[in-house]
Amino acid sequence: GFVAGLHSFMREARLQAQFSHPALLEVYRVWEQNGTAYMAMRYYRGVTLREMLRTNPQIATEQWLCETLDPILLALQELHNEKCYHRDIAPDNILVLPNGRSVLMDFGAARRIIGGMTRALTTVLKPGYAPIEQYSDDGSMQQGAWTDIYAVGGVLYHAMTGKVPVQAISRMMNDPLKPVAAAARGE
């Protein structure tokens, strides 16, 4: 209930506040007061990558994608160096600012790995962007940096083809995912 949600919010906010990278949301302060929790963060004006691709799909040139996603990959490197994994990367969690800078949002699924185990393992996934290990609800499949990199690959596929990738679970047998070149041509 509420208490579990409060603890989850505080865990997310504190984790996010530990990092300082231009492609990560900047958290100024996290605190509990009046029986609830607060997170003061920088205000960002922008549009999600999902919305940008929906309204202007031609924007997704190779150069634009490199300029947009390189900062995200560098931010992920910083997270991964600290054994922290975002686990929810998708076009709706990438904000593109008016100056073209991109920012990775929503640390709700992020977990820090301690001793090979994630704290409070939960099944969190975004169909099309989540690798197969995120479909395991018993924690039997290990997650790591590759989990986030798979999701970035899904974001690239979506940007280049205009289509959400086929879910990882559906790709296990007789993979129906079209190669990006064929899908981009509409084949």
Name each region found by the language model.
Residues 1-18:
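AlphaC helix of the eukaryotic protein kinase fold
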Residues 30:
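Activation-segment/catalytic-loop signature of the eukaryotic protein kinase fold
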Residues 34-48, 52:
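Conserved short submotifs of the Hanks-type protein kinase catalytic core
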Residues 72-84:
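Protein kinase catalytic-loop region centered on the HRD/HxD motif
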Residues 96-100:
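Activation-loop N-terminal segment of eukaryotic-like protein kinases
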Residues 128-187:
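C-terminal lobe helix-coil module of Hanks-type protein kinase domains
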